[in-house]
Amino acid sequence: MTEFELPPKYITAANDLRSDTFTTPTAEMMEAALEASIGDAVYGEDVDTVRLEQTVARMAGKEAGLFCVSGTLSNQIAIRTHLMQPPYSILCDYRAHVYTHEAAGLAILSQAMVVPVVPSNGDYLTLEDIKSHYVPDDGDIHGAPTRLISLENTLHGIVYPLEELVRIKAWCMENGLKLHCDGARIWNAAAQSGVPLKQYGEIFDSISICLSKSMGAPIGSVLVGNLKFVKKATHFRKQQGGGIRQSGMMARMALVNINNDWKSQLLYSHSLAHELAEYCEAKGIPLESPADTNFVFINLKAARMDPDVLVKKGLKYNVKLMGGRVSFHYQVTRDTLEKVKLAISEAFDYAKEHPFDCNGPTQIYRSESTEVDVDGNAIREIKTYKY
Amino acid sequence: MTEFELPPKYITAANDLRSDTFTTPTAEMMEAALEASIGDAVYGEDVDTVRLEQTVARMAGKEAGLFCVSGTLSNQIAIRTHLMQPPYSILCDYRAHVYTHEAAGLAILSQAMVVPVVPSNGDYLTLEDIKSHYVPDDGDIHGAPTRLISLENTLHGIVYPLEELVRIKAWCMENGLKLHCDGARIWNAAAQSGVPLKQYGEIFDSISICLSKSMGAPIGSVLVGNLKFVKKATHFRKQQGGGIRQSGMMARMALVNINNDWKSQLLYSHSLAHELAEYCEAKGIPLESPADTNFVFINLKAARMDPDVLVKKGLKYNVKLMGGRVSFHYQVTRDTLEKVKLAISEAFDYAKEHPFDCNGPTQIYRSESTEVDVDGNAIREIKTYKY
Amino acid sequence: MTEFELPPKYITAANDLRSDTFTTPTAEMMEAALEASIGDAVYGEDVDTVRLEQTVARMAGKEAGLFCVSGTLSNQIAIRTHLMQPPYSILCDYRAHVYTHEAAGLAILSQAMVVPVVPSNGDYLTLEDIKSHYVPDDGDIHGAPTRLISLENTLHGIVYPLEELVRIKAWCMENGLKLHCDGARIWNAAAQSGVPLKQYGEIFDSISICLSKSMGAPIGSVLVGNLKFVKKATHFRKQQGGGIRQSGMMARMALVNINNDWKSQLLYSHSLAHELAEYCEAKGIPLESPADTNFVFINLKAARMDPDVLVKKGLKYNVKLMGGRVSFHYQVTRDTLEKVKLAISEAFDYAKEHPFDCNGPTQIYRSESTEVDVDGNAIREIKTYKY
Amino acid sequence: MTEFELPPKYITAANDLRSDTFTTPTAEMMEAALEASIGDAVYGEDVDTVRLEQTVARMAGKEAGLFCVSGTLSNQIAIRTHLMQPPYSILCDYRAHVYTHEAAGLAILSQAMVVPVVPSNGDYLTLEDIKSHYVPDDGDIHGAPTRLISLENTLHGIVYPLEELVRIKAWCMENGLKLHCDGARIWNAAAQSGVPLKQYGEIFDSISICLSKSMGAPIGSVLVGNLKFVKKATHFRKQQGGGIRQSGMMARMALVNINNDWKSQLLYSHSLAHELAEYCEAKGIPLESPADTNFVFINLKAARMDPDVLVKKGLKYNVKLMGGRVSFHYQVTRDTLEKVKLAISEAFDYAKEHPFDCNGPTQIYRSESTEVDVDGNAIREIKTYKY
């Protein structure tokens, strides 16, 4: 029987700056998994799954939590649960993951139109940005009134200023709008800003809190909100095919980092990002946005830098990149930081002689690398995806 | 039995600049209606309906046409018919009617995401605008690849430059994208630019050609495309509830203006608009876009003009307005043009003393007029809708 | 320029038993149309459209009415308006038009699953039929709870017994379910049973009341319900592309028969159907259901009768048939009744020698007639559709 | 801080006859998990996930496989991937899980209507059942043509006769219809009938093969089909929120039983079921269908047995039941078999004195158990769901 076509064995995320989703389960997590509960979570009978849900809900000051296998699932069922009867639309940042990277779930599941807004300050949406794009429910039968504002914290690695969130929340309450947070990296926002999850919980009607990114769990997220909201979201989770059976092991492994000193782990990854940002600034390498937390976004357009060259320069130094976004996480080593500095500056120098104009909606160019890198070293095919 | 609560009798559109949909059936049309065929169009057995469909299809150089009761119906079933299997998205101008004023049909019927693009030149989308926002189908499972470009001609009253359309069409064909045209006012574009409908027909895979706006028919539009496209669109028309029975009278009345000198009628309405635009420019009243055809868009934001005051000033001179868009059509009189000049300049002067900052997505503010206008004259409630 | 490919001129519905939608506008209607109002109904400014809506609403004892271009449109927007947030399902008769002949609108517009029930008595659903198929909302996340019961009166020409409707209504109210009526032929039910429309209005939360079938109007229906319901339905009507402009003529023509002695007209058509039913029974020709009103359903399966032969036998006597359903309406002549008796009995005799077993979901076989009928007479291609 | 409200610790599935989803991970599986790969499966970089997918695909003779977190997810994305452009419908058994227990996914994700068919033989759909309910694509714009037949093997524990599947497949190919199999218990069908998975793979275009039911894995299923099909299904999996990161452990644990002697394990569970079926028959306790494999369906309606009493009688003997379906799996002990015999016969005797008429669409009554069982023993609340 012919051999399976298997990918190469994934050894470590220590040199993987493509995304913080590459964090790998630790030995401590594996040990914990052996003790996990074995109930069927669809029937609400798995202890560790319930413990995880209530732990994260309590941290966010919410009545209930729902374990979901991905952030896309928790975002999309949260938005669907807030929306009642169309025609309606949701408003979000034009870079929001719910709009750009969740494969049209908003249209398919929620039948929702989207008003994607470019922040006037370039970094995050202000209340004024929202008010000037919000579609009021004034009885106009042509329209699709805005029913929900979906924000992302962090977005593009930027920490959402708390006072702006408070202003937006007050206005939402006055206008009967729901406020959801894609908290794929809300742990990073909390760690960096010192704002406790509970305070974010007071602002947002629901938060999708990812576990498998900076927090290092194998899979999943927890969607938090009030009891009625989570009960209905559970129905949508089943409808989406997200109802899973013995999830105890996955829940127990996620609880390990939650019960550890996650703030220090995350702040370590932020420090690497801050250092790289300073390095770039010193070198005149333009960045897209302030590197508040674990991401550094190299402005490929302004630098006229070919993302494919950047990826290959990374490989030259045995560092994995996917494009303009450099994603630090707690498993990245200082050695990798030093190497990525070299890769970026060489790619920047290369761009000065070979300016590249990428004309696509995102700075990330699907890197169809050839067999040979710029320096002639053989490279296996890299399947890189947009961040 | 209590009397019905009926609206006031609508007498004439001569002074109605709210929209060109207010054009009223002419005596000639009424006469024609008496001779109309009486077959059941759902079974394809109504002569005048088939005659209208084939007349307009032939004018646009297309194989077939489908009579629809509204432009929203023909636009939405056209887009649905071009789209096969989600996840996908369509790309259009951020002001496009299919996106802003068709009550989320794109999400509900077609499960489509929308990439609304702000034209870099402020007037119409260039090929570069499209290429820099187009989502390629590169296998990225996060995305919703662009499958269709939907343009509008005219949009905001602006005639789409033919050469730009030709460039966009060539690129669409290279990239396997369909190109639809919301031709609510394509007659206006053709009349003003001299580009025959047939040439537009060569560029667009489908065109929704409205009959009830500048062309003065009571209801409807004709969706033109190839035979296979129209056959499938017929199925979606029935699904949307748009299959109608004895439509002969409506078809026959639409054919009257199509067989008349429609170009002169439209060019007359354009001349009124051009004259108003010049008047405004002379007075320093800012406009949003060039008044190529029958619309003049007063830039309420730049003029800091309260649309509600503008509407009431119009009523003072017995001219009906809905906000910043002044919509001429062939039934508007020169007398109305003179009166609307006065109304606009008084509203502009009023704004200099009472600057108004409208913070909404459209310049049109839903005019909740009081019982009394600015000059004390009693006014019945106006139900005005966004243009 | 080549001639248009036009269908033959449709002269009269006097011999057309395919469907009561073939009723043609009368001279009286054409006269009335000349006096019709000319306002834009999307803005609520057309007098005759508002008059039609309030007339029919008042007849049904409802707060408001909404003119729609087809029964499919009013049925589908009614059901969508009653449904709030999925997952949910509606329950109806397995032969219901909303389920079998509205091109999947329930799934596309309303995202609704359907529980189609076969009536235990073979004619209409009883409360027990409904209770034994109803999906309770008991928190089971696997299910799609029943939110709405959609009944049809008449269905298959059968008048729904009032007392059964009253029982079903009471149970619906106890269980928080909405009750919609597809009233494509509710006029026939009212005329035959003597139950006033107003009494049906007390039972059903909404009724889609067709105008273009037995009532002979060119197009449309009126959806009646409470004010809040109709306001939201208007939004869905626009979304479906059903918002039409100068609909005064169509409204005025519909009002003609409403203000005439429509009961006598309908009872005349019922009398023809009753006579044909008695004729069939006397001949041993099996019927599918009691011919309460204007339909006679020949049981093709039991009679082992080929619908294609029946259609062609009809043509032999210049009578148009589409299959097992014989649809009488007030424009059918007694002469046509006598001829269809001959056609049916000849087809029945033919079946005795050429038994035909149609194995399709409906008794109607899409009649791909050849150029020559059974008796050798040349026949134009008939495009017949399922009833 | 108040204690969490945790469910009781789930110890063993040995006495759990509610569903075979309650099978718990074995020590062997836990050991295997420790060696699992740690790549990110969204990027196709996890070795064990790819190995699982290719193992199951190869067993079913298919080009590719896709690991999904649930059978609902793999069923719904399979059906969506086969369907191109609505309006369309799918045809299935009225008891099919895709129709009754996947929370309206067919309407929400696929916009599909469903034709649920009652098998004429009471057990499984024959080709004739399908042909007499299939909606042909004959151009009828009222309809929603059948595009896909979704069968379930086993369904209701019944093994689908191979020759019937072969007949159905041939007819589907003639009529251009896709054929999907919900293989939640296809392992049971294969074990019992001796038909290899590969032969089922030749018949069905796609099969959703569950791992977490009789095969005992913690979560998931593998959807198998051709390469193009699986590539598109991957896009829908991401859209549904089913893209998960480090799934190596879950994949490795599923491979344990696949690489063990699963047939013996399953046949053991079947033997228990057969024994119970014989016991019931001997006692005159009516069954709904032949107990071919691991399920015994007590006909509650015919036995006039209250499912709530049955559940409580089970608890009296420390055996967990959810209603009429008794689900055996390889972790159930002979002791449990003996006890469930007692529970069922006592409930049956109880029914003779207290006949119960359950009037709901399914024989399973949501068991709102009181604090005390029929024999006075205190019982914790059971959250039982429909099978």
From Swiss-Prot, chains A, B, C, D:
The modification Phosphoserine is found at S367, S369. The modification Phosphothreonine is found at T370. There is a cross-link at K228 (Glycyl lysine isopeptide (Lys-Gly) (interchain with G-Cter in ubiquitin)). SUPFAM superfamilies: PLP-dependent transferases. Keywords: Isopeptide bond, Lyase, Phosphoprotein, Pyridoxal phosphate, Ubl conjugation. It holds the Pfam family Beta_elim_lyase. It catalyses: L-threonine = acetaldehyde + glycine; L-allo-threonine = acetaldehyde + glycine. The keyword Phosphoprotein applies. GO terms for cellular component: cytosol. Its cofactor is pyridoxal 5'-phosphate. Pathway: Amino-acid biosynthesis; glycine biosynthesis; glycine from L-allo-threonine: step 1/1; Amino-acid degradation; L-threonine degradation via aldolase pathway; acetaldehyde and glycine from L-threonine: step 1/1. InterPro entries: ArAA_b-elim_lyase/Thr_aldolase, Low_specificity_L-TA-like, PyrdxlP-dep_Trfase, PyrdxlP-dep_Trfase_major, PyrdxlP-dep_Trfase_small. One of its GO terms (molecular function) is L-allo-threonine aldolase activity. Its EC number is 4.1.2.48. The modification N6-(pyridoxal phosphate)lysine is found at K213. One of its GO terms (biological process) is glycine biosynthetic process. NCBIfam families: GntG_guanitoxin. Present with 106000 molecules/cell in log phase SD medium. Belongs to the threonine aldolase family. This is Low specificity L-threonine aldolase. The lineage of its organism: Eukaryota, Fungi, Dikarya, Ascomycota, Saccharomycotina.
